[in-house]
Curated annotation (Swiss-Prot):
Residues 136-139 are annotated as: G4. This is Elongation factor Tu. Residues 19-26 are annotated as: G1. Its main location: cytoplasm. The gene is tuf. Residues 81-84 are annotated as: G3. InterPro entries: EF-Tu_GTP-bd (IPR041709), EF-Tu_GTPase (IPR050055), EFTu-like_2 (IPR004161), EFTU_2 (IPR033720), G_TR_CS (IPR031157), P-loop_NTPase (IPR027417), Small_GTP-bd (IPR005225), T_Tr_GTP-bd_dom (IPR000795). Mg(2+) binds at T26. Gene3D superfamilies: P-loop containing nucleotide triphosphate hydrolases, Translation factors. Belongs to the TRAFAC class translation factor GTPase superfamily. Classic translation factor GTPase family. EF-Tu/EF-1A subfamily. Its EC number is 3.6.5.3. It comes from Moorella thermoacetica (strain ATCC 39073 / JCM 9320). The lineage of its organism: Bacteria, Bacillati, Bacillota, Clostridia, Moorellales. Disulfide bonds: none annotated. It holds the Pfam family GTP_EFTU. GTP binds at residues 19-26, 81-85, 136-139.
Length: 400
């Protein structure tokens, strides 16, 4: 079968379903594909196709994730759904599936449950910026007052974790009823609710800023000298763009920030007018000595990112089966933290009342590195011991 060409006509947004086990995340995902398929915007994907999601390995961590795609009139969406709670935790911490917004599914019959809370907390911690709520299984609730009560509870919970609980769109419906009906019409009592949800997602979750529009950043992978021309750093542009004549800062591994000017940009030995996010390039730097730059530093737009040593993080600790530790670790644990292209030693401070961390746990912690690294909220990292990955984390707040 010939592959369809991906037409880049609509803005692209990444979303995902989150919420407590058995509240209907996967059924809703299926219902969205069925309803949108009626308007030619999706391939209908059945529950069991989504539920038996293949396991993927992201940085050595096994995560089961289902990916579906669909289109509304306004946008193209990539949607992730995970079968198990542990998969969500790993997914959100590793950033394996970046979400520009999440659809929180809450069963109207049960109200918010422990994983509802945990997923909202994780969304807040790892920087999922927007949430839209689908209050599911309303066919099982006869009392409209009960429905109002659940909605209020959900709004309060969202507010508790610093989401705008009063503004967040909440759509009520039944994913199962929409699936059973299958007409996919907007006028339909059940299918119409799925359309209402997609309208809310379309309007409430903004189109994310493209990587090329963000401030320039390139992690340095290699450094060499070209006789008579100067020092060249190579790497893949993570975001933004860079051209000859741009002023950049060299940040990380030293306390001071070094300013320089890009005097040449090359890609595959060819001279480039401008390099953009995703390009693997070499940059010639004015007046910089080979000894002043090393792998693990970054080139960045002046003022856009700072070197730090101390930060808070949300961390997932690999299980023994995933190749992680076989034993717990304690306060003062000193592994390597792998940021972008290099390892830096750091010390772990556990929250008060936490004695130890077991393989398979996810935990908030404070980390202090022995040398500064260019760090910002949302940056992902790996925790390593002797070259093997034992954990994955995301920076949730800078301390110093």
């Amino acid at each position: 079968m010939a592959k369809q060409k991906y037409e880049r006509t609509k803005p692209h947004v990444n979303v995902g379903t989150i919420g407590h086990v058995d509240h209907g995340k996967t059924t809703l995902t299926a219902a969205i594909t069925f309803c949108l398929a009626k308007a030619g915007g999706a391939v209908p994907t059945a529950y069991d196709q989504i539920d038996k999601a293949p396991e993927e390995r992201e940085r050595g961590i096994t995560i089961a994730t289902a990916h579906v795609e669909y289109e509304t009139e306004k946008r193209h969406y990539a949607h992730v759904d995970c079968p198990g709670h542990a998969d969500y935790v790993k997914n959100m911490i590793t950033g394996a599936a970046q979400m520009d917004g999440a659809i929180l599914v809450v069963s109207a019959a049960d109200g918010p449950m422990p994983q509802t809370r945990e997923h909202i907390l994780l969304a807040r911690q790892v920087g999922v910026p927007y949430i839209v709520v689908f209050l599911n299984k309303v066919d099982q609730v006869d009392d409209p007052e009960l429905l109002e009560l659940v909605e209020m509870e959900v709004r309060e919970l969202l507010t508790e974790y610093e989401f705008p609980g009063d503004e967040i769109p909440i759509v009520t419906g039944s994913a199962l009823k929409a699936m059973e009906c299958g007409c996919g019409k907007r006028e339909c009592e059940w299918c119409g609710k799925v359309w209402e949800l997609m309208d809310a997602v379309d309007s409430y979750i903004p189109t994310p800023e493209r990587d090329t529009d963000k401030p320039f950043l390139m992690p340095i992978e290699d450094v060499f000298t070209i006789t008579g021309r100067g020092t060249v750093t190579t790497g893949r542009v993570e975001r933004g763009k860079v051209k000859v004549g741009d002023e950049v800062e060299i940040i990380g591994l030293r306390d001071e920030i070094r300013k320089t000017v890009v005097t040449g940009v090359e890609m595959f030995r060819k001279i480039l007018d401008e390099a953009v996010a995703g390009d693997n390039i070499g940059t010639l730097l004015r007046g910089v000595d080979r000894k002043e730059v090393e792998r693990g530093m970054v080139l960045a737009k002046p003022g856009s990112i700072k070197p730090h040593t101390k930060f808070n993080a949300e961390v997932y600790v690999l299980t023994k089966e995933e190749g992680g530790r076989h034993t717990p670790f304690f306060n003062g644990y000193r592994p390597q933290f792998y940021f972008r292209t290099t390892d830096v030693t750091g010390v772990v401070n556990l929250p008060e009342g936490v004695e130890m961390v077991m393989p398979g746990d996810n935990i908030r912690m404070t980390i202090e590195l022995i040398t500064p690294i260019a760090i910002e909220e949302g940056l992902r990292f790996a925790i390593r011991e002797g070259g093997r990955t034992v954990g994955a984390g995301v920076v949730t707040g800078i301390i110093e």
